[in-house]
């Protein structure tokens, strides 16, 4: 069919407008749901301020800490994990073929001795060279194994884990003393909960001592400051809104808790994806729903884990490209979840939404800007029509970011200094006018890399000294 050029312009204009209206409309709905969930969480949080009294019914937890060339930070990470406020847990460090002396540092710091453990290798991994146990901390073990990537290291940790719950922790994560208690509560309250994720915030600009957060602050540089706003929106709204529907597809690998048996039955973490954390969650949805087994995957909105954000464009670009590749791989490997007969809201709502707006979103957004601006410059589009498009594409995005910031201020209120709110408002503006478009471009590159690129297992960002908040 040979449509006139003007008809193609009209079609393109309507398509991009409808796309962005649908995108922002769904996010608005998720926002409204999230507000209710946060309100309920805040009432429970008030009870948590009372002195901790453990009932003795708490399920013991295995903390898995995969490490590859983490010599500079591994001791602080392990020390902080050993000081968590929880009745019974073990810490398992998995040294994944490090070449920088990580194992030797652990041996000296924690008096490691060979441990003749009998491990059930229910999940296939690269060869385990040795297992050590600390003479000073009986609940600390270290697995030394050949390099196989983060997912392979986590599988080795699951094989050695003694407890029914396990929690993967990144080596650069900063926890709070009650982080385990908050994340494990849903597992204790509901036996059908098989996975729980927590809200992740950025440690850039915060004061950290002994591996624990002492004071919350904002980073002084613009790039990580923008990411603070981005994380607020992503965790407070982008994920929490799916929980009442049992349709949460992402639990951050930075700090997530799982029941061990369903994960082992599902085959553990896949080693052929850079998004092993999301892929496992989507696969659990697919397997549990297909088997018609009752299950829930939940989210704890409390800020219980703090991680370092990239402070340079090169590291941030690499991170976002990996995330987009991981998203594409997770959806592709579990495509049978889409519109499955028993898939529920995860397969009928969250999965198609993620394909349309998260996976293909960068392509449509970049294409929309290019199409509408080109049509305007060529005289096919009025300035009024262009402004309407920009308002829908950018104005609603600005509103959503502002609502995330507002919810943070009304609930957790972590950023207390007078200058913090103006700084966050500035970052909110910059995020939507420049950063968002650059991020979409990186994500588009990541999508193309999934189609044509090579594998990459361990993703690294350039580490900085822990920044201190300004006085």
What are these regions (language model features)?
Residues 1-57, 239, 368-374, 402-407, ...:
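N-terminal membrane-anchoring/stem segments of glycan-assembly enzymes
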Residues 26, 115-155, 159, 163, ...:
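Long helical/loop segments within the catalytic core of UDP-sugar-dependent glycosyltransferases
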Residues 30-88, 104-107:
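N-terminal signal-anchor transmembrane helix
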Residues 53, 353-451:
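Membrane-embedded multi-pass helical conduit in multi-pass membrane proteins
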Residues 59-62, 90, 264, 279:
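Cell-envelope/extracellular polymer assembly enzymes that use nucleotide-activated donors
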Residues 79-143:
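Acidic donor-binding segment of Leloir-type glycosyltransferases
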Residues 166:
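Short aromatic/hydrophobic "clamp" motif used to bind/position activated sugar donors
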Residues 262-265, 273-298:
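A short, conserved alpha-helix in the catalytic core of glycosyltransferases
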């Amino acid at each position: 069919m040979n449509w006139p050029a003007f008809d193609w312009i009209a079609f393109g204009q309507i398509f991009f407008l409808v796309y962005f209206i649908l995108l922002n409309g769904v996010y608005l709905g998720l926002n409204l749901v999230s507000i209710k969930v946060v309100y309920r969480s805040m009432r429970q949080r008030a009870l948590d301020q009372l002195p901790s009294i453990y009932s003795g019914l708490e399920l013991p937890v295995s903390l898995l800490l995969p490490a590859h060339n983490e010599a500079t930070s591994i001791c602080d990470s392990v020390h902080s994990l050993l000081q968590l406020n929880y009745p019974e847990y073990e810490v398992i460090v998995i040294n994944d073929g490090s070449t920088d002396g990580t194992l030797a540092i652990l041996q000296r710091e924690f008096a490691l001795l060979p441990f003749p453990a009998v491990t059930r290798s229910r999940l296939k991994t690269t060869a385990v060279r040795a297992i050590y146990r600390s003479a000073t901390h009986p609940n600390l073990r270290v697995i030394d194994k050949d390099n196989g990537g983060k997912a392979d290291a986590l599988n080795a940790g699951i094989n050695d884990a003694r407890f029914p719950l396990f929690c993967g922790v990144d080596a650069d994560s900063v926890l709070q003393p009650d982080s385990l208690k908050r994340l494990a509560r849903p597992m204790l309250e509901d036996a059908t909960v098989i996975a729980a994720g927590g809200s992740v915030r950025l440690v850039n600009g915060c004061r950290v001592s002994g591996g624990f957060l002492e004071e919350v602050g904002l980073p002084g540089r613009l790039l990580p400051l923008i990411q603070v706003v981005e994380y607020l929106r992503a965790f407070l709204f982008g994920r929490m809104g799916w929980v009442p529907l049992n349709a949460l597809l992402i639990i951050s690998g930075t700090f997530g808790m799982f029941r061990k048996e369903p994960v082992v039955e599902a085959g553990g973490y896949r080693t052929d994806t850079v998004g092993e954390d999301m892929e496992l969650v989507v696969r659990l949805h697919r397997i549990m729903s297909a088997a018609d087994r009752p299950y829930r995957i939940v989210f704890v909105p409390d800020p219980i884990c703090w991680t370092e954000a990239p402070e340079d464009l090169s590291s941030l670009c690499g991170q976002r490209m990996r995330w987009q590749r991981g998203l594409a791989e997770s959806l592709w490997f579990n495509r049978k979840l889409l519109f499955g007969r028993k898939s529920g809201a995860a397969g009928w709502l969250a999965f198609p939404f993620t394909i349309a707006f998260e996976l293909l979103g960068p392509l449509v957004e970049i294409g929309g800007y290019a199409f509408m601006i080109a049509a305007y410059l060529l005289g096919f589009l009025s300035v009024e029509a262009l402004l309407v498009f920009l308002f829908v594409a950018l104005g609603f995005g600005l509103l959503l970011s502002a609502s995330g910031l507002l919810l943070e201020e009304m609930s957790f209120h972590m950023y207390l200094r007078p200058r913090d709110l103006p700084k966050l408002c500035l970052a909110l503006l910059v995020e939507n006018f420049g950063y968002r478009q650059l991020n979409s471009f990186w994500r588009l590159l990541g999508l193309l890399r999934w189609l044509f690129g090579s594998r990459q297992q361990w993703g690294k960002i350039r580490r900085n000294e822990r920044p201190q908040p300004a006085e």
